[in-house]
Amino acid sequence: MVPPAHESDALTIGFRWVFSNKMPVAQQSGHAIYDPAPSGTLKSGYTWNIRYGDGSGASGVVYADKVTIGGVTATSQAVEAATSVSSSFASDQNNDGLVGLSFSTINTVSPVKQLTFFDSIKSTLVSPLFTATLRKGAPGSYDFGYIDATKYTGSIAYAPVNSANGFWQFTSTGYVVGSGAAVGTSYSAIADTGTTLMYLPTSIVQAYYSKVAGAQYSSTYGGWIFPCASAMPSFSAIIGGQARTVPGSYINWAPISSTTCFGGMQYNTGIGFTIFGDVFLKSQFVVFDSSVPRIGFAQQK
């Protein structure tokens, strides 16, 4: 089983599962499908079930198989083969599953949790780390075992990681909206390439959209909207004592009409922590270092 090396939409800091030929035929349409027959071995009695905050989910069975990503191989990786997925996953033909790069404590396989891909291969790497360089409107890449200095500018700002919950979780100590002054406030955050938007505390989101002409919270759309023509300020998170900035144009996420757009920054209500998803990460070179553990951010070149 060999996914493309630069399959940014399929690699996530969260869980690992794939579309498989064990799903209903209607759900397989338009997707790359995992067939365990050539080399996979069924782990009898092992199942998994994942539900996400947006109501989507998937469930299935488990195989042991050889998995290679970007030249790195796990010889007996637990592959969570979907037997059923929610309609939102079935209709998204840009997504054929998720590759887990988090800590194995987050794994949902029963009766015994399985190692994530990264935990399976990290002992074979020169350094037990990987980096993510996601791009806006262009293919991104992941590197395993080394840091490519040609992909970022300036220094890498590191913050300690709390891995107790299985996430790459760290503390941001403040933020900056546009060219304004830094606001010191600590909040717990995770970096997750499997999440599209940024989800932040209410006070920070309100502070940001107060600087966007015509912005308002819409109960109809369940988030902040604004005139598409509005100038969008940048947003910087203070991480490891340094500001790491996402351009305002990235936060103008998607049109919902010919004149109105939906914001890439929304409330983290009910989540319990901040999530820096792709809207933020596509401006950053991110180092996930399991040796300490720690996470590092630098501005992309």
Name each region found by the language model:
Residues 67, 100, 144, 194, ...:
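A residue-level signal for conserved active-site and pocket-lining positions in enzyme catalytic cores
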Residues 68, 75-184, 260-266:
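Aspartyl protease catalytic domain
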Residues 84-85, 234-301:
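Aspartic protease catalytic domain
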Residues 5-7, 180-208:
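Active-site beta-strand/loop microenvironment that shapes enzyme catalytic pockets
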